């Protein structure tokens, strides 16, 4: 039974008007963008189904494709689940929830899932033919990452490449210039596992399909971190500088802190 049909039944049962439903539907899209857990729950309580579609995709993928990054992401996913989300891939759902206990149980039954490929629309570093560890990196889900590694996931596993040959990034790429540095816990986790910081990819199409889409050619995790200084990324210059210093020390043993951050020339 489709999500739209379910919503129409709910509208009839609760005597919502179509306008009321659409108002809540559009409100839900805004609440997803803001990672407003209570706002999402309110919309589901007023006739919107978590199994509805938006832009020809299930609503849950609007959540995974938005640009906001926060610790509330997993709670937003939980709101979908609590209102009877129909999601077939329970292993992926466990990762999105950062439910380590559930993930561990599923992987005991299906250990090969650590190498399964996924493609999700993503506002930043592409999630094209990635595995679950890339997804953990994107959303800063350390507990799930620890379970995946325990079950044999490789911290240097590579994503797929597109028709141009771009891609092939390892999970740490998703952490080095993340929105508001929200993947710093995963960054530190990968460093604790001695992830390879010298892997160079042909290029990455950052923000593919969004207004900020940008080709970033020939990068490794350290140079990719520097791309956070691009104006379309809206990252903090001091934060990026600290990340680069951390990566340089981990990769090359160089203990260096940039002395001209923020850049004096640009402040004149």
Task: Describe the residue ranges of each PLM region.
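Ankyrin-repeat boundary/"N-cap" motif
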Residues: 21-30, 52-67, 86-97, 116-135, ...
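Ankyrin-repeat intra-repeat helix-capping/turn positions
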Residues: 35, 72, 98, 140, ...
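Ankyrin repeat domain, specifically the short helix-to-loop turn at the C-terminus of the second helix
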Residues: 41-49, 75-86, 107-119, 146-155, ...
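Surface-exposed loop/turn motifs in large extracellular/passenger domains
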Residues: 140-142, 179-185, 236-242
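Terminal, low-structured helical/coil segments at or just beyond the last alpha-helical repeat
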Residues: 234-268
């Amino acid at each position: 039974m489709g999500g739209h049909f379910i919503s129409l039944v709910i509208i009839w049962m609760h005597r919502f008007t179509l306008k009321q439903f659409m108002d809540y539907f559009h409100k839900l899209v805004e609440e997803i963008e803001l990672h407003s857990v209570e706002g999402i729950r309110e919309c589901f309580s007023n006739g919107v189904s978590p199994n509805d579609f938006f832009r020809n995709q299930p609503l849950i993928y609007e959540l995974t494709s938005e640009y906001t990054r926060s610790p509330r992401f997993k709670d937003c996913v939980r709101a979908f689940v609590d209102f009877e989300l129909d999601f077939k891939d329970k292993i992926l759902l466990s990762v999105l929830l950062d439910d380590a206990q559930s993930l561990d149980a599923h992987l005991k039954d299906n250990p090969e899932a650590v190498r399964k490929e996924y493609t999700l629309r993503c506002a930043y570093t592409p999630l094209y033919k990635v595995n679950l560890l890339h997804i953990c990196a994107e959303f800063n889900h350390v507990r799930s990452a620890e379970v995946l590694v325990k079950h044999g996931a490789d911290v240097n596993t590579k994503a797929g490449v597109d028709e141009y040959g771009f891609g092939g990034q390892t999970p740490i790429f998703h952490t080095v210039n993340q929105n508001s540095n929200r993947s710093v816990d995963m960054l530190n986790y990968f460093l604790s596992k001695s992830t390879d910081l010298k892997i160079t990819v042909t290029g990455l199409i950052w923000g593919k399909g969004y207004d900020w889409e940008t080709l970033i050619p020939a990068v490794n995790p350290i140079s990719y971190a520097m791309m956070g200084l691009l104006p379309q990324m809206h990252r903090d210059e001091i934060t990026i500088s600290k990340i680069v210093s951390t990566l340089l020390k981990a990769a090359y043993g160089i203990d260096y802190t940039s002395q001209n951050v923020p850049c004096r020339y640009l402040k004149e």
